[in-house]
A protein has these predicted regions:
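Active-site ligand-binding patch in enzyme domains
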Residues: 2-133
């Protein structure tokens, strides 16, 4: 099994600051590497707080890399996976609405409520209502 961790950190070792705005630490060269890594993965895992704060789409942003995935018999983008204890995620987040790949939410909350409804509503867009507790 191969696991890749991709993180941008500041020179003093921080991932983020305390402001409500997204802290951009990556350069265009960094983003090219991010898309190369995404294209090589089966799945991308992000925490729920990343979805809430950054609203990432988690797509492979390079058309050549997307085509290479398709040529290998894969979907254009890796499966999206998140972890949430609270289920406080908007069904309108890019995680759920952007891309046709499967979306998986692992949670320990007993009632995913609107999150499950949002996922079910988007089943035709590739969103799975698979939840793990």
């Amino acid at each position: 099994m191969k696991v890749t961790v991709s993180t941008a950190v500041s020179a003093d070792g921080y991932l983020d600051d305390r402001s409500p705005d997204r802290l951009i630490l990556s350069t265009p060269e960094d983003w090219a590497e991010v898309h190369r890594l995404r294209a090589a993965c089966d799945a991308i895992l992000v925490g729920a707080e990343t979805i809430r704060r950054d609203n990432p789409s988690l797509l492979v942003g390079d058309e050549v890399l997307r085509r290479e995935r398709i040529d290998r018999g894969l979907s254009p983008d890796p499966v999206k996976v998140t972890l949430t204890a609270s289920c406080r995620l908007s069904p309108e987040a890019n995680f759920f609405t952007r891309g046709d790949q499967e979306k998986i939410v692992f949670t320990s909350c007993s009632d995913p409520g609107p999150l499950r409804q949002g996922a079910t509503r988007r089943r035709d867009h590739g969103c799975s209502d698979r939840y793990r507790t």
